[in-house]
Amino acid sequence: MYKKSEIEIEVLPANEGDCILITIEKEDIYILIDGGTAETYRNYLKTRLIQLRNEGKEIDLLIVTHIDNDHIGGIIELLKENGSDMDSKIIRIKNIWHNSYRHLQFDKNQTLGKSEKNILNKIIANGEVSLNYNVGKSSPISAIQGTTLAGLIFEGYYHWNEQSEGQAIINNGINYQFGKECFISVLKPNISDLEKLGKKWKIDLKKSKYSFVFSEDKLFDDAFEYYCRCMLTDGNGNNEKICYSNHNTEEMTIEEISREPMSEDNSITNRSSISVIIRYRNKKLLFLADNIADDVLEYLSQEDRGYSLVKLPHHGSANNISDDFVERIESDTYLVSTNSEKYNHPDIETLAKIACKRTEYVKRIYFNYKIDKVADFEKKIYGMNDIEFVYLGEGQKIYL
């Protein structure tokens, strides 16, 4: 939290989501990872981006990790107001990384028929109804208006996945260079992840029509996005598939909590989210989106054990992190982005795993909201010399 070097991390209030701005000062590089909800954009992100624009700055890279309302809602609002790459009203965005329908790994060279169009239009219409119902319960003014992220990127002529020549952003062993000394490598997704996501999409569509044909028509992009945004919800916008920790930890020791068994997250969209390592000089930052930590481990070499910062996957869900990951990864700075209100993240089991790892250095876990159950758990770690919780106030940053 105290300025000591050349990287700044701003974790904007994003309710249950992510909106993270990374600044590499010496090279004037700005990286935005996700945009939280529409409310995040209106209340925080827009003001910050206009401030950067007025200082003559640009966003060098916008990473939209996956199609989920608490990650893309703010980006949709930003791109609506921003206009186009050639005439940016809010701020110039030089590159966007985002995997959409067009990046799924299967043939799409057929001709779209009338019945397929009707089915896709129904998916879009049902998606708008479902999302408006869900959003309206928490923020009545942020109604979904039928605009998709993929459509806005395409119609705004933004540089979309340009580093991979317009193809999917995947783990391909390449270190993408930004500026002189900043390099970004992709850990997830891999081709298999996108194939599985595409397979599920095809199976579900063929339930409506067995011989469903697939094309490059924009209608597919829009329908796929609504499909992913509603994949975790029922018709009323209620979450069906996220597993919650429901252990009563009040009378348990930290060690007992850390050993509580959890079910691994089986969400295909989460496993397809973009996780990256950002390297600058001697620093490495690990951003795990909503991925599963063990899926990432297989891509990390022994040299990749130490990190200046680890953004915990899926807002600190115990279903996305394991003992093996905590033991293998060395870091003194962890980050959790959530207000805990919708999905009850972070899980106390995750915090206990990190607290129970004995280190000669102090491990700091940063939160962008004060959360009651985290404060209660903090009482359990009182007196431990190698763990500290830090609550970021509005405008406060992490300095690395």
Model-derived regions, located:
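Long, well-ordered mid-to-C-terminal structural blocks that present hydrophobic/aromatic surfaces
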Residues: 260-320
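Active-site environment of divalent metal-dependent phosphoester hydrolases
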Residues: 16-18, 38-39, 67-73, 103-105, ...
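Hydrophobic "anchor" residues on beta-strands that sit immediately upstream
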Residues: 9, 30, 62, 95, ...
